[in-house]
């Protein structure tokens, strides 16, 4: 268990994230964990790490080879969890899945993930949250593990991100065009930024319902709706008074009403009619964000931010998650940081960050990305730890 005190520098670690978490990340020192681990879906990206000489680091190869097999190392890790101080429900869940699945690649993947998720839970603040990005081949198993570690009551959302359009005709099933992001809070005190949970209206492309509700326009084109100003059955006498020749029980005090009238926000639709409030569309928070995200496009080969990294996610996706769950100055941790999208998003939003990856290629790519985006001076704001140098 790490007890080192954090400093003000961001950190980019080269190494096995399990070792880094255990030895270098203190308890309750992180506000948000986002992880996009290798999916157990038989995809192989290991060729990415071949050097021009043809040599490969075995650690790098195994780190990004998206196929997991049950081995002596898997058995050792499984026994370690059962003998550890992990909650009994975690041990029960793993034992049950071993009975269900047998000693196969799926179980090996789940054991590897359980070790790391236990450590990630430890390093999270009580006000923190974790979001795990996966695909449907493993999401149902991972949710069992997360429920056991965080508690089912701390499950927040299963976010569906549509990462591609239809992949064409499938003979015996529908094509898979989405990823899953499982969100958990550390406790009911975990942060949630409500203002970030709305999508700004596209005033040039409104859905029919919103366009119908805000159908009226000012001469300058601003859309608005007229809403009721009369109040509920509130007995307070100061809410009953005359406005524009009409006496009613109103929602607001006289002072607030006069202020709105002075701002031309209260109008009388017709002579003698009940005054109403002008609610402008562009003053509203926006459309509430749901748990199916279709508005963030995947990166295609022409995308300006694309780095050629096979599992690179859009910057906008990470910016949204960070904005929803953290405040400026909070610490964001990505234990599978890949090409550095999470740390880039955290940097843009004024958060501190920790990135970990087991491949030198990923760590060097993240370093280069940050320096290219923010200038060489950014290098003074973070440490690179564990990098082997000649």
Where are these regions (language model features)?
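Core catalytic lobe of class I
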Residues: 1-367, 372-376
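Post-kinase regulatory C-tail/linker adjacent to protein kinase catalytic domains
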Residues: 381-390
């Amino acid at each position: 268990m790490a007890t080192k005190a954090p400093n003000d520098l961001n950190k980019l670690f080269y190494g096995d994230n399990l070792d880094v978490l255990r030895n270098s990340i203190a308890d309750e020192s992180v506000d948000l964990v986002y992880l996009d681990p290798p999916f157990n879906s038989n995809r192989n990206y290991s060729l990415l790490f071949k050097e021009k000489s043809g040599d490969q680091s075995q650690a790098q190869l195994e780190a990004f080879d998206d196929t997991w097999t049950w081995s002596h190392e898997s058995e050792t890790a499984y026994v370690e969890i059962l003998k550890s101080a992990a909650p009994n429900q975690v041990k029960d869940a793993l034992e049950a899945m071993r009975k269900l699945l047998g000693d196969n690649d799926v179980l090996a993947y789940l054991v590897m993930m359980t070790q790391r998720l236990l450590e990630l839970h430890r390093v999270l603040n009580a006000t923190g949250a974790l979001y795990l990005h996966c695909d449907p081949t493993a999401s149902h198993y991972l949710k069992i593990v997360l429920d056991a570690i965080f508690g089912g009551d701390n499950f927040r959302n299963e976010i569906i991100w549509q990462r591609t359009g239809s992949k064409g005709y499938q003979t015996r099933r529908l094509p898979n065009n989405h990823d899953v992001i499982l969100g958990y809070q550390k406790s009911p005190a975990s942060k949630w930024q409500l203002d970030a949970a709305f999508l700004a209206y596209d005033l040039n492309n409104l859905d029919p319902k919103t366009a119908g509700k805000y159908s009226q326009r000012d001469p300058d084109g601003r859309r608005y709706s007229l809403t009721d100003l009369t109040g509920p059955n509130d007995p307070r006498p100061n809410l009953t008074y005359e406005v524009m020749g009409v006496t009613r029980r109103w929602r607001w005090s006289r002072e607030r009403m006069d202020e709105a009238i002075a701002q031309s926000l209260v109008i009388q639709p017709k002579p003698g009619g009940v005054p109403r409030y002008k609610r402008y569309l562009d003053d509203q928070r926006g459309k509430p964000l749901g748990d199916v995200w279709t508005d963030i496009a995947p990166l295609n080969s022409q995308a300006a931010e694309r780095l050629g990294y096979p599992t690179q996610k859009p910057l906008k996706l990470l910016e949204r998650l960070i904005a929803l769950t953290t405040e400026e100055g909070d610490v964001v941790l990505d234990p599978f940081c890949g090409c550095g999208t999470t740390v880039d998003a955290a940097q843009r939003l004024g958060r501190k960050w920790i990135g970990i990856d087991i491949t030198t290629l990923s760590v060097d790519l993240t370093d280069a990305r940050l320096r290219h985006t923010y200038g060489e001076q950014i290098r003074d704001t973070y440490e690179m730890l564990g990098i082997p140098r000649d």
